[in-house]
Regions:
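Secretory-pathway luminal glycosyltransferase catalytic domains
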Residues: 1-85
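Generic alpha-helical propensity signal that fires on short helical segments
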Residues: 61-63, 108, 151, 172
Length: 176
C-alpha cells in the first residue's frame, strides 16, 4: 500500500527523519555528485520510466503517453523553478537514463547514473538537494518529504498520479 499521506504521521516528522537518516558509512557515495549538489541550487528530479505507462513494452519514444506527460510536467516544473531559484542545477535520477539526455539541456542537468543499482546512494543524495520536482513515485516522494531544507520548493504533478488518494501530496507542495 501507499504510505504517503502525511496527515497520519506529521506529528512524528522529526522522529521519522531521524529513523530514516542514512549514515555515511552505509553508502558507497560518489563524492563528485555530493559536491555538485552541495555547491549549487540543486533540484532533484526522479523519473521512473514505464511504471504506469499503458503498454507493457519499453517504448521510449515521444509517442509513449506516460513519457510525454511526464516530460511535459518536468518542463513546466523546470520553468517554475527557474522563475523562483537563482541559477538552479538539475540532478536527474532514473531507472533508465538511456534516452533522457535528448530531452534536457546538458548545461543545466547532471544525470546520476547508478550503475551499481544501489538505491540507498540515491536516497542519501536526496538529503542534500535544495529543491524537488517529484514524479509519481513513492521513492522520490519520501526523498523529498524527508529532506530537511526548510526553504525547499517541492513541485508535484497535478494529474500524473493514478492514485485516488486525495491527500497523497503534502499541502505545501506546488502542483503543476
Amino acid at each position: 500500500g501507499h504510505y504517503e499521506s502525511e496527515k497520519y504521521f506529521i506529528d512524528y516528522k522529526k522522529e521519522i527523519i531521524q529513523f530514516f537518516k542514512i549514515k555515511k558509512e552505509k553508502v558507497d557515495i560518489n563524492n563528485r555528485y555530493k559536491k555538485d549538489i552541495d555547491n549549487s541550487n540543486s533540484v532533484s528530479i526522479c523519473i521512473r520510466q514505464n511504471r504506469y505507462s499503458e503498454g507493457k513494452h519499453k517504448d521510449h519514444d515521444k509517442s509513449n503517453k506516460f513519457t510525454k506527460d511526464t516530460i511535459d510536467y518536468i518542463y513546466k516544473s523546470i520553468e517554475h523553478i527557474k522563475k523562483n531559484v537563482e541559477k538552479p542545477k538539475f540532478f536527474i535520477w532514473s531507472n533508465d537514463l538511456s534516452n533522457l539526455s535528448g530531452y534536457f539541456n546538458q548545461d543545466e542537468c547532471i544525470f546520476i547514473d547508478n550503475k551499481q543499482n544501489k538505491s540507498v546512494n540515491d536516497f542519501y543524495l536526496f538529503n542534500f538537494c535544495k529543491h524537488f520536482i517529484v514524479g509519481p513515485t513513492s521513492f522520490h516522494w519520501w526523498g523529498a518529504w524527508l529532506n530537511e531544507n526548510p526553504n525547499k520548493i517541492c513541485i508535484r504533478p497535478l494529474n500524473l498520479n493514478p492514485s485516488n488518494n486525495i491527500d497523497f501530496w503534502p499541502e505545501n507542495w506546488v502542483s503543476i
